[in-house]
Protein backbone atom coordinates (compact mmCIF):
# COMPACT_ATOMS: atom_id res chain seq x y z
CA UNK A 1 0.00 0.00 0.00
CA UNK A 2 1.35 3.45 -0.86
CA UNK A 3 2.27 5.63 2.10
CA UNK A 4 0.28 8.53 0.67
CA UNK A 5 -2.98 8.20 -1.19
CA UNK A 6 -1.98 10.65 -3.93
CA UNK A 7 1.07 8.55 -4.77
CA UNK A 8 -0.59 6.06 -7.11
CA UNK A 9 0.75 2.66 -8.08
CA UNK A 10 1.49 3.98 -11.60
CA UNK A 11 3.51 6.88 -10.23
CA UNK A 12 5.44 4.57 -7.90
CA UNK A 13 6.25 2.22 -10.79
CA UNK A 14 7.36 5.20 -12.88
CA UNK A 15 9.57 6.40 -10.01
CA UNK A 16 11.10 2.93 -9.53
CA UNK A 17 11.85 2.70 -13.25
CA UNK A 18 13.23 6.24 -13.41
CA UNK A 19 15.68 5.62 -10.55
CA UNK A 20 16.76 2.17 -11.78
CA UNK A 21 20.16 3.29 -13.15
CA UNK A 22 21.01 5.16 -9.96
CA UNK A 23 19.93 2.21 -7.81
CA UNK A 24 21.89 -0.37 -9.80
CA UNK A 25 25.06 1.74 -9.83
CA UNK A 26 24.80 2.54 -6.12
CA UNK A 27 24.18 -1.01 -4.93
CA UNK A 28 26.80 -2.54 -7.21
CA UNK A 29 29.36 -0.19 -5.65
CA UNK A 30 27.97 -0.82 -2.16
CA UNK A 31 28.16 -4.60 -2.58
CA UNK A 32 31.80 -4.36 -3.68
CA UNK A 33 32.64 -2.11 -0.73
CA UNK A 34 31.60 -4.71 1.89
CA UNK A 35 32.66 -7.92 0.15
CA UNK A 36 34.36 -10.29 2.60
CA UNK A 37 33.30 -8.19 5.60
CA UNK A 38 30.92 -9.20 8.37
CA UNK A 39 30.97 -6.00 10.40
CA UNK A 40 31.28 -2.29 9.75
CA UNK A 41 34.86 -1.16 10.38
CA UNK A 42 37.09 1.73 9.30
CA UNK A 43 37.74 0.14 5.90
CA UNK A 44 34.03 -0.36 5.20
CA UNK A 45 33.34 3.26 6.17
CA UNK A 46 36.14 4.48 3.89
CA UNK A 47 34.69 2.42 1.05
CA UNK A 48 31.17 3.67 1.80
CA UNK A 49 32.43 7.26 1.71
CA UNK A 50 33.83 6.64 -1.76
CA UNK A 51 30.57 5.00 -2.90
CA UNK A 52 28.49 7.99 -1.80
CA UNK A 53 30.83 10.58 -3.31
CA UNK A 54 31.03 8.74 -6.65
CA UNK A 55 27.21 8.49 -6.59
CA UNK A 56 27.06 12.32 -6.66
CA UNK A 57 25.77 12.70 -3.11
CA UNK A 58 28.50 15.33 -2.62
CA UNK A 59 31.41 15.51 -0.19
CA UNK A 60 29.77 17.50 2.63
CA UNK A 61 26.58 15.45 2.67
CA UNK A 62 28.59 12.21 2.45
CA UNK A 63 30.66 13.20 5.50
CA UNK A 64 27.46 13.96 7.45
CA UNK A 65 26.13 10.47 6.64
CA UNK A 66 29.45 8.79 7.53
CA UNK A 67 29.60 10.69 10.85
CA UNK A 68 26.13 9.43 11.76
CA UNK A 69 27.08 5.83 10.97
CA UNK A 70 30.34 6.19 12.96
CA UNK A 71 28.26 7.37 15.94
CA UNK A 72 26.10 4.27 15.56
CA UNK A 73 29.17 1.98 15.40
CA UNK A 74 30.63 3.63 18.53
CA UNK A 75 27.33 3.16 20.36
CA UNK A 76 26.54 -0.40 19.28
CA UNK A 77 30.19 -1.57 19.31
CA UNK A 78 29.52 -4.20 16.65
CA UNK A 79 27.46 -3.34 13.57
CA UNK A 80 26.90 -5.99 10.93
CA UNK A 81 27.26 -5.04 7.27
CA UNK A 82 23.80 -6.56 6.73
CA UNK A 83 22.42 -3.68 8.83
CA UNK A 84 24.14 -1.05 6.70
CA UNK A 85 21.35 -0.72 4.11
CA UNK A 86 18.68 -0.04 6.72
CA UNK A 87 20.86 2.51 8.53
CA UNK A 88 21.79 4.28 5.27
CA UNK A 89 18.14 4.40 4.24
CA UNK A 90 17.14 5.93 7.58
CA UNK A 91 19.93 8.53 7.49
CA UNK A 92 19.16 9.62 3.91
CA UNK A 93 15.43 9.89 4.71
CA UNK A 94 16.29 11.99 7.77
CA UNK A 95 18.55 14.31 5.72
CA UNK A 96 15.84 14.85 3.10
CA UNK A 97 13.32 15.56 5.85
CA UNK A 98 15.43 18.48 7.12
CA UNK A 99 15.16 20.30 3.77
CA UNK A 100 11.72 19.07 2.72
CA UNK A 101 9.64 19.80 5.81
CA UNK A 102 6.50 18.83 3.93
CA UNK A 103 6.26 16.79 0.77
CA UNK A 104 4.56 18.28 -2.28
CA UNK A 105 1.06 16.86 -2.30
CA UNK A 106 -0.20 16.45 -5.84
CA UNK A 107 -0.63 19.62 -7.87
CA UNK A 108 -2.49 21.72 -5.34
CA UNK A 109 -1.69 25.43 -5.08
CA UNK A 110 -2.32 28.05 -2.39
CA UNK A 111 -5.14 30.54 -2.93
CA UNK A 112 -4.21 34.24 -2.85
CA UNK A 113 -6.89 36.94 -2.49
CA UNK A 114 -4.92 39.29 -4.78
CA UNK A 115 -4.90 36.96 -7.78
CA UNK A 116 -3.48 33.70 -9.16
CA UNK A 117 -0.53 31.77 -7.77
CA UNK A 118 2.61 32.88 -9.65
CA UNK A 119 5.54 30.57 -10.37
CA UNK A 120 8.69 32.09 -11.87
CA UNK A 121 10.84 29.37 -13.45
CA UNK A 122 14.61 29.80 -13.72
CA UNK A 123 17.43 27.61 -15.02
CA UNK A 124 20.08 27.44 -17.74
CA UNK A 125 19.29 26.37 -21.30
CA UNK A 126 19.23 22.62 -21.82
CA UNK A 127 18.10 21.53 -18.36
CA UNK A 128 14.53 20.85 -19.49
CA UNK A 129 13.09 24.16 -18.28
CA UNK A 130 10.51 24.63 -21.05
CA UNK A 131 9.53 20.95 -20.92
CA UNK A 132 9.11 21.22 -17.14
CA UNK A 133 6.84 24.25 -17.60
CA UNK A 134 4.77 22.35 -20.19
CA UNK A 135 4.42 19.31 -17.94
CA UNK A 136 3.54 21.49 -14.95
CA UNK A 137 0.88 23.27 -17.00
CA UNK A 138 -0.54 19.92 -18.11
CA UNK A 139 -0.72 18.52 -14.59
CA UNK A 140 -2.18 21.69 -13.10
CA UNK A 141 -4.81 21.62 -15.85
CA UNK A 142 -5.51 17.93 -15.11
CA UNK A 143 -6.01 18.93 -11.48
CA UNK A 144 -8.73 21.36 -12.60
CA UNK A 145 -6.65 24.54 -12.48
CA UNK A 146 -6.83 27.34 -15.02
CA UNK A 147 -3.28 28.02 -16.25
CA UNK A 148 -1.63 30.92 -18.12
CA UNK A 149 1.95 30.82 -19.43
CA UNK A 150 4.25 33.83 -19.80
CA UNK A 151 7.19 33.73 -22.25
CA UNK A 152 9.71 36.01 -20.50
CA UNK A 153 12.72 34.14 -21.89
CA UNK A 154 12.99 36.57 -24.79
CA UNK A 155 16.74 36.14 -25.20
CA UNK A 156 16.31 33.13 -27.52
CA UNK A 157 13.68 32.95 -30.27
CA UNK A 158 13.59 29.17 -29.81
CA UNK A 159 12.53 29.57 -26.17
CA UNK A 160 9.40 31.52 -27.12
CA UNK A 161 8.61 29.12 -29.98
CA UNK A 162 9.01 26.08 -27.72
CA UNK A 163 6.70 27.54 -25.10
CA UNK A 164 4.08 28.33 -27.77
CA UNK A 165 4.24 24.68 -28.90
CA UNK A 166 3.74 23.52 -25.32
CA UNK A 167 0.82 25.91 -24.77
CA UNK A 168 -0.88 24.50 -27.88
CA UNK A 169 -0.12 20.91 -26.90
CA UNK A 170 -1.45 21.34 -23.37
CA UNK A 171 -4.29 23.67 -24.39
CA UNK A 172 -3.52 26.65 -22.16
CA UNK A 173 -3.17 30.34 -23.15
CA UNK A 174 0.24 31.99 -23.49
CA UNK A 175 1.27 35.63 -23.30
CA UNK A 176 4.29 36.41 -25.47
CA UNK A 177 5.81 39.35 -27.33
CA UNK A 178 8.48 37.52 -29.31
CA UNK A 179 12.26 37.66 -29.19
CA UNK A 180 14.07 40.65 -27.62
CA UNK A 181 10.90 41.95 -25.95
CA UNK A 182 11.33 43.29 -22.41
CA UNK A 183 10.97 40.20 -20.13
CA UNK A 184 9.39 42.26 -17.33
CA UNK A 185 6.83 43.67 -19.77
CA UNK A 186 5.84 40.13 -20.82
CA UNK A 187 5.50 39.07 -17.17
CA UNK A 188 3.38 42.16 -16.44
CA UNK A 189 1.04 41.37 -19.35
CA UNK A 190 0.86 37.69 -18.37
CA UNK A 191 -0.24 38.51 -14.83
CA UNK A 192 -2.76 41.12 -16.02
CA UNK A 193 -4.17 38.60 -18.50
CA UNK A 194 -4.32 35.86 -15.85
CA UNK A 195 -6.19 38.14 -13.44
CA UNK A 196 -8.67 39.11 -16.17
CA UNK A 197 -9.29 35.43 -16.94
CA UNK A 198 -9.59 34.45 -13.27
CA UNK A 199 -6.74 32.00 -13.73
CA UNK A 200 -5.51 29.89 -10.82
CA UNK A 201 -1.83 29.74 -11.71
CA UNK A 202 0.62 31.66 -13.91
CA UNK A 203 3.94 30.09 -14.93
CA UNK A 204 6.59 32.55 -16.13
CA UNK A 205 9.58 31.32 -18.15
CA UNK A 206 12.82 33.32 -17.81
CA UNK A 207 16.23 33.41 -19.50
CA UNK A 208 19.05 31.52 -17.80
CA UNK A 209 22.22 33.33 -18.81
CA UNK A 210 24.59 32.36 -16.01
CA UNK A 211 27.63 33.62 -17.93
CA UNK A 212 26.54 37.14 -16.99
CA UNK A 213 25.22 36.89 -13.45
CA UNK A 214 24.91 40.66 -12.97
CA UNK A 215 22.58 41.01 -15.98
CA UNK A 216 20.65 37.92 -14.90
CA UNK A 217 20.25 39.22 -11.36
CA UNK A 218 19.10 42.62 -12.59
CA UNK A 219 16.64 41.07 -15.04
CA UNK A 220 15.11 38.70 -12.46
CA UNK A 221 14.88 41.50 -9.89
CA UNK A 222 13.05 43.71 -12.40
CA UNK A 223 10.63 40.90 -13.35
CA UNK A 224 9.87 40.25 -9.68
CA UNK A 225 9.34 43.96 -8.95
CA UNK A 226 6.93 44.36 -11.86
CA UNK A 227 4.96 41.23 -10.96
CA UNK A 228 4.64 42.36 -7.34
CA UNK A 229 2.92 45.54 -8.58
CA UNK A 230 0.25 43.49 -10.37
CA UNK A 231 -0.18 40.83 -7.69
CA UNK A 232 1.29 41.74 -4.29
CA UNK A 233 3.61 38.98 -3.11
CA UNK A 234 4.26 37.61 -6.61
CA UNK A 235 6.13 35.57 -7.56
CA UNK A 236 5.02 33.22 -4.81
CA UNK A 237 7.38 30.53 -5.99
CA UNK A 238 10.78 30.77 -7.71
CA UNK A 239 11.40 27.32 -9.12
CA UNK A 240 14.92 26.40 -10.22
CA UNK A 241 15.09 23.60 -12.80
CA UNK A 242 18.25 21.46 -12.68
CA UNK A 243 19.38 18.60 -14.92
CA UNK A 244 20.03 15.66 -12.58
CA UNK A 245 22.18 13.91 -15.19
CA UNK A 246 24.87 16.60 -14.81
CA UNK A 247 25.61 15.52 -11.24
CA UNK A 248 27.79 18.00 -9.37
CA UNK A 249 27.36 20.62 -12.14
CA UNK A 250 23.71 20.82 -11.08
CA UNK A 251 24.87 21.61 -7.55
CA UNK A 252 27.10 24.42 -8.85
CA UNK A 253 24.18 25.87 -10.85
CA UNK A 254 22.00 25.77 -7.74
CA UNK A 255 24.61 27.75 -5.80
CA UNK A 256 24.98 30.34 -8.58
CA UNK A 257 21.24 30.84 -9.07
CA UNK A 258 20.79 31.19 -5.31
CA UNK A 259 23.14 34.17 -5.49
CA UNK A 260 21.18 35.65 -8.42
CA UNK A 261 17.72 35.35 -6.84
CA UNK A 262 15.86 33.87 -3.86
CA UNK A 263 15.10 30.32 -5.00
CA UNK A 264 12.49 28.58 -2.84
CA UNK A 265 11.78 25.38 -4.80
CA UNK A 266 13.69 22.92 -7.00
CA UNK A 267 12.72 20.69 -9.92
CA UNK A 268 15.35 18.06 -10.75
CA UNK A 269 14.88 16.58 -14.23
CA UNK A 270 16.25 13.74 -16.39
CA UNK A 271 16.82 11.33 -13.50
CA UNK A 272 15.67 8.41 -15.65
CA UNK A 273 18.66 8.66 -17.99
CA UNK A 274 21.40 8.76 -15.38
CA UNK A 275 23.08 6.97 -12.48
CA UNK A 276 23.59 10.34 -10.78
CA UNK A 277 20.31 10.43 -8.83
CA UNK A 278 22.28 10.84 -5.61
CA UNK A 279 22.56 14.52 -6.52
CA UNK A 280 18.97 14.96 -5.25
CA UNK A 281 20.18 14.08 -1.74
CA UNK A 282 23.21 16.37 -1.84
CA UNK A 283 21.48 19.41 -3.34
CA UNK A 284 18.54 19.12 -0.96
CA UNK A 285 20.84 18.82 2.04
CA UNK A 286 23.40 21.49 1.14
CA UNK A 287 21.09 24.13 -0.33
CA UNK A 288 18.29 23.72 2.22
CA UNK A 289 15.80 24.37 -0.59
CA UNK A 290 12.86 21.96 -0.92
CA UNK A 291 12.88 19.63 -3.91
CA UNK A 292 9.35 20.08 -5.23
CA UNK A 293 9.35 18.02 -8.45
CA UNK A 294 11.50 15.33 -10.05
CA UNK A 295 11.54 14.21 -13.69
CA UNK A 296 11.69 10.43 -14.06
CA UNK A 297 10.67 9.94 -17.71
CA UNK A 298 9.56 11.45 -21.00
CA UNK A 299 5.80 11.24 -20.38
CA UNK A 300 3.60 14.18 -19.37
CA UNK A 301 2.90 12.46 -16.04
CA UNK A 302 6.59 11.71 -15.38
CA UNK A 303 7.21 15.05 -13.72
CA UNK A 304 6.27 13.97 -10.22
CA UNK A 305 5.72 15.82 -6.95
CA UNK A 306 8.73 14.92 -4.80
CA UNK A 307 7.99 12.59 -1.91
CA UNK A 308 11.08 11.90 0.17
CA UNK A 309 9.85 8.60 1.63
CA UNK A 310 8.85 7.18 -1.76
CA UNK A 311 12.11 8.45 -3.32
CA UNK A 312 14.30 6.70 -0.74
CA UNK A 313 12.04 3.64 -0.87
CA UNK A 314 12.63 3.38 -4.62
CA UNK A 315 16.40 3.72 -4.17
CA UNK A 316 16.52 0.94 -1.59
CA UNK A 317 13.77 -1.37 -2.89
Named regions from a protein language model:
Residues 35, 93, 99, 105-317:
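P-loop/Walker A NTP-binding module and the surrounding RecA-like catalytic core of P-loop NTPases
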Residues 1-120, 138, 142, 146-149, ...:
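Non-catalytic terminal/linker segments enriched in charged/polar, low-complexity residues
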